[in-house]
Amino acid sequence: MSTNEGSLWGGRFADGPSDALAALSKSTHFDWALAPYDIKASKAHARVLHRAGLLTDEQRDGLLAGLDSLGSDVADGSFEPLPTDEDVHGALERGLIDRVGPDLGGRLRAGRSRNDQVATLFRMWLRDAVRRVADGCLEVVNALAVQAAAHPTAIMPGKTHLQAAQPILLAHHLLAHAHPLLRDVDRLADFDDRTAVSPYGSGALAGSSLGLDPDAIAEDLGFASAADNSVDATASRDFAAEAAFVFAQIGVDLSRLAEDIILWSSTEFGYVTLHDAWSTGSSIMPQKKNPDIAELARGKSGRLIGNLTGLLATLKAQPLAYNRDLQEDKEPVFDSVAQLELLLPAMAGLVGTLTFDEERMAELAPAGYTLATDIAEWLVRQGVPFRIAHEAAGAAVKVAEGRGVGLDALTDDEFASINPALTPDVREVLTVEGSVNARNARGGTAPTQVAKQLGVVRKAMEELRIRLS
């Protein structure tokens, strides 16, 4: 049997828990990450107890000094949980009692439960974590923006269904990857607004009868307000699920960028060369330069999605209020943050060091008859109904395919035989430069519009940094 040493309960039990139960209940191997937040919250709790008349000045000061000492020892690693400690809360109470004695150290637990305590600490940890993740996302966005600025007129094949579609600017494509990541950071900023609500003072579920001030401790801990419902505050983990969703969405957005890089770096595409420092080789094939960062981004996106799915499954059938199932809420979120903190700097470095082959992309831009839409839209500008224009452009592609040439190689007579409206003037749109320049509406791929898009991305980056600072 376990001795139950290091637990915060046991008075009504005749004996300690079984060894198997103690092993199952133990959470210090992951919740120790909350230790700095636990100490900070304990200091705020001591001040609230003092204001409520439950601690003398001397007792408050003694607890604060003991917590300062304990915090320093936690920070430098000289105080760590013991195998007998059930969780971070019990370990830290043991450490505090070692420093200030059982009479004074035992007073701190008044008016709080592990239920409101851990709900608060998890929110505090996440509010810091999302800022780190947001910073990492913005570094990837910045790398995309820098590459876009370095290639303002480079033209590449735009694709749908992974088939040649229309010519676009490389910068346009790169910025298309920046926008989803900016939305992810915007979601993280919104998430912080909803998470800045403190459960402290909710007790186990019903609130406190000791005259404590939840708003005071909320302000002390940097929250915008205290919770309005103590049952909801202790039992709800929608904030964790929301964070896990945004982390998974970031993974998905990075995976799509990674997939492009993997394709572009292949011999068949040949758009980019990977920097040596951001790629790996093969143990048997000496010629290989592998896009491992991009491949790991694809792989880790599945892990992030799994963390979200697992957390939602844990939360889906719990009656109010707190249940021990919620011990399982932290590991998937902690893991998602850890994976993104590994992945985001690597993706920023990979993107920032890509070398693009502009000639190769320009050579492939008209392949696959990507200017067919330009013929159809040119006819529309001449007054031809789009249905007829679409058919005529398709017929031009069929003739060119039959001859094994590009659209620009068709003769004037061939164009005229397809549709009399296809005069020699149609050749003004039969260049990739003309096609790109013509798409000058907001959001389009014309250089003037892409330059504006780059400005929008840079402005959004700065605004988001300010929101999250």
Swiss-Prot record:
Catalytic activity: 2-(N(omega)-L-arginino)succinate = fumarate + L-arginine
Single GO cellular component term: cytosol
GO MF annotation: an example: argininosuccinate lyase activity
InterPro entries: Arg_succ_lyase_C, Argininosuccinate_lyase, Fumarase/histidase_N, Fumarate_lyase_CS, Fumarate_lyase_fam, Fumarate_lyase_N, L-Aspartase-like
Listed SUPFAM superfamilies: L-aspartase-like
UniProt-listed Pfam families: ASL_C2, Lyase_1
Lineage top rank: taxon: Bacteria
GO terms (BP aspect): arginine biosynthetic process via ornithine; L-arginine biosynthetic process
Entry keyword set: Amino-acid biosynthesis, Arginine biosynthesis, Cytoplasm, Lyase
Gene3D superfamilies for this protein: Fumarase/aspartase (C-terminal domain), Fumarase/aspartase (Central domain), Fumarase/aspartase (N-terminal domain)
Enzyme category, top tier: lyase
Compartment(s) where it occurs, according to its Swiss-Prot or TrEMBL record: Cytoplasm
HAMAP family (UniProt xref): Arg_succ_lyase
Family: Belongs to the lyase 1 family. Argininosuccinate lyase subfamily.
Protein name, per record: Argininosuccinate lyase
Name of the coding gene: argH
